[in-house]
Regions:
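Hydrophobic residues on short alpha-helical segments
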Residues: 15-22
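A short acidic, leucine-rich amphipathic alpha-helix
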Residues: 18, 30-36, 49
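Amphipathic alpha-helical dimerization/coiled-coil segments
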Residues: 77-112
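Short, cationic-aromatic polyanion-contact patches
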Residues: 3-14, 27, 60-83
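Short coil turns linking two alpha-helices in DNA-binding domains
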Residues: 38-43
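Active-site phosphate-binding and catalytic loops of NTP-dependent enzymes
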Residues: 57
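DNA major-groove recognition helix of helix-turn-helix
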Residues: 46
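Glycine-centered, phosphate/nucleic-acid-interacting loop/turn motifs that mediate DNA/RNA or nucleotide
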Residues: 53-54
């Protein structure tokens, strides 16, 4: 992942909102409804964010309509952008596996 690619992705409309909402696994439909973003735009933004490794495919879940849908989660808890002279660097503090497991347990409990 190039720093400039991450910065460009963060500068695109809706991407920061999607990343904020992706602290727990969500489907494109959930992003669209919760953030009032057109569904086609959501899919394009998800693709862009996964290409820059800011978001990843987390799972495929069964919806209420008995259809499988993909859910996505951000790959980090903290992002730092540092400018030094003409150089720029991006550091991601990745989500801990323990936090991911806790999130999964809470999501499973909420679904029951």
């Amino acid at each position: 992942m190039e720093s400039i690619d991450v910065i460009n992705a963060l500068g695109n409309e809706y991407n920061p909102d999607i990343l904020r909402a992706a602290h727990q696994p969500r489907s494109a439909k959930e992003f669209s409804e919760d953030l009032d973003v057109p569904i086609a735009t959501c899919y394009r933004r998800i693709e862009e964010l996964t290409k820059t490794d800011l978001l990843s495919h987390h799972d495929r879940i069964l919806t209420d309509g008995q259809r499988r849908t993909s859910v996505y989660r951000r790959n980090f808890d903290v992002i730092e952008i540092e400018f030094e002279g003409e150089d720029v660097s991006v550091t991601l503090q990745e989500r801990s596996p323990v936090q991911n497991k806790l999130d999964n347990v809470w999501r499973d409990l909420a679904d029951t």
